């Protein structure tokens, strides 16, 4: 049994409602993909720390899935014993209640990615110790989220042509 399969099995045992799949990428590396409910998300993150106290939180990525907002975490486990285990944890929240639990008390670096998710798609990480904007200026309008694909995304009148050569329209003289 590979380390990835071992991690997947332990997650399945502890979280029977989670969707857990081991996939092999085109380079032959195994990845463990987990889809977890927001109610069990924080407990899963604590469990990951139990499995590997040195687990490395790589990145969190916010996503707009139509009716839901998602947050995809990449964590590397057992990296000091090659090959490490690449773990991807996907959690979703409905757009009408986009609340997920903060996990920065477990993985402190996750806070910067949570802050990005708050300002870019409108996720709310309940209990986050710092909810200040990370990238957007203070005068950017509240309730508009640059990576949303619905009516809360950037309206057309805010979009300006920054001069990209493929988008410029030249006037004919």
UniProtKB/Swiss-Prot annotation:
Q: Does the keyword Cell membrane apply?
A: yes
Task: Tell me its EC number(s), please.
Answer: 1.12.7.2
Give the top-level enzyme category. Answer: oxidoreductase
BP-aspect Gene Ontology terms: proton motive force-driven ATP synthesis
Sorted keywords for this record are: Cell membrane, Membrane, Metal-binding, Nickel, Oxidoreductase
The reply on keyword Ubl conjugation is no
Highest taxon of source: Archaea
Question: Record's Pfam families?
Answer: Complex1_30kDa (PF00329)
Q: List the cofactors.
A: Ni(2+)
**Activity versus temperature?**
Optimum temperature is 90 degrees Celsius for membrane-bound enzyme but 80 degrees Celsius for the purified enzyme. Membrane-bound enzyme has a half-life of 2h at 100 degrees Celsius whereas the half-life of the purified enzyme is 30 minutes at 100 degrees Celsius.
> Where is the protein localized?
Cell membrane
Its recorded reaction(s) are:
H2 + 2 oxidized [2Fe-2S]-[ferredoxin] = 2 reduced [2Fe-2S]-[ferredoxin] + 2 H(+)
Q: How is its activity regulated?
A: Inhibited by 0.1 mM Cu(2+).
**Major subcellular site:** membrane
User: Which SUPFAM superfamilies does the record match to this protein?
Assistant: Nqo5-like
GO MF entry, a single one: NADH dehydrogenase (ubiquinone) activity
Details of cofactor binding? Binds 1 nickel ion per mole of protein.
GO CC, alphabetical: ferredoxin hydrogenase complex; plasma membrane
pH dependence, entry free text: Optimum pH is 7.0. Active between pH 6.0-8.5.
Record function comment: Beta subunit of a hydrogen-evolving hydrogenase that utilizes protons both as a substrate for hydrogen production and proton translocation. Acts by coupling the redox reaction via ferredoxin and iron-sulfur (Fe-S) clusters to proton translocation across the membrane thereby conserving the redox energy in a proton gradient.
Q: How does it assemble?
A: The membrane-bound hydrogenase complex is composed of MbhK and MbhL, and may also contain MbhJ.
Q: Which family does it belong to?
A: Belongs to the complex I 30 kDa subunit family.
Q: What is this protein called?
A: Membrane-bound hydrogenase subunit beta
Per the UniProt record, the source organism is Pyrococcus furiosus (strain ATCC 43587 / DSM 3638 / JCM 8422 / Vc1)
Gene (name only): mbhK
